[in-house]
Amino acid sequence: VAVFNEGRIQQLAAPPQLEHWRTDHVMAALLTHGEDLSGDFVLGQAMLERVQRAHLRPPPAVAAADRGTRYAELAAEAVAGETARPSLGGEFPKFATCVHLGEDRYRHVLVKFTETANTPAKRRWVDLLICEHLAARVLAGQGIAAAASELVVAGERLCLEVERFDRIGAHGRRGTVTLAALDDAFHDQHDDWPHAAARLARDGWIDAPTLATIRWLHAFGMLSELGAAGEREGQTHLHRG
């Protein structure tokens, strides 16, 4: 996950909102701070050498038993802009970290978190994080690939820890591409999952079973975002990556 705090963004002379970056902003960022990109790409010799050096030692990690304390600290740092923030879509604030499970076992994760104040917004976030966790378990129970997740209480915050599917063990990486990147490269339509998937299937990039799964997941996602009053809460959660 490419991550950028306020200081790094200022060094790049880039807009504060990542969606407003131009290609030159993106390239400059990836060549100077691109050692932990989504997927398996490493861009430039400097970043490659940084990754290779990192492989010589265990990754910086949070002990599984210490997650409640450390996640509270990492969330506070993320809110204050002291730690780099992931360049990921979605409504919830989040940070990336690694969990040490004991011996030589590690799990790279993304952690979403609520605010601390007891407000209606926080209560909504708590409900949504719990629902997201349960939804992933339902999908996995039906044999559909879904990231493993866990709820962690961190002080006055509730955190949803989601295992990264683009990481394997301490240093392994798995290639990925977002729907946004793939669809925009060929079609540039900026619409929803089913329409984008239909275009990719039409052009031979995905097969019919994959298209059917994407349509099913989109319908499941829309239903899971129904609010208690029956109104749709947040299509923003169904972003394209």
Would you name each region that the model predicts?
Residues 1-241:
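Phosphate/dinucleotide-binding and metal-coordinating scaffold of catalytic cores
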